[in-house]
Swiss-Prot record:
Any GO molecular function: translation elongation factor activity
Classification via PANTHER family: ELONGATION FACTOR 1-BETA
Keyword Cell membrane: no
UniProt protein name: Elongation factor 1-beta
Taxonomy of the source species: Archaea, Methanobacteriati, Thermoplasmatota, Thermoplasmata, Thermoplasmatales
Amino acid sequence: MGDVLVVFRVLPEDVDNDLSRLESKIREKLNGVCKINDIKTEEIGFGLKALNVQAIMPDEEGMADRVESILAGIEGVSQVDTKDISLI
């Protein structure tokens, strides 16, 4: 089996959340679980921004769900959606 690139959209709880601090928490929590390829800020509207987290992980059953659960459990995160999964 190979690896997959999964893109997660992470929405903060509040428009006033510090996204750089949230990005640091994401990197800390996912350290050792998967490799973070990139994290980009996405403008949603009305001042709301999301983080698009590109994570590389083994193509194993349940791995993307595990990472999504870890992201959802981070303080300051309101919602996590899986945007894209691609075999690499």
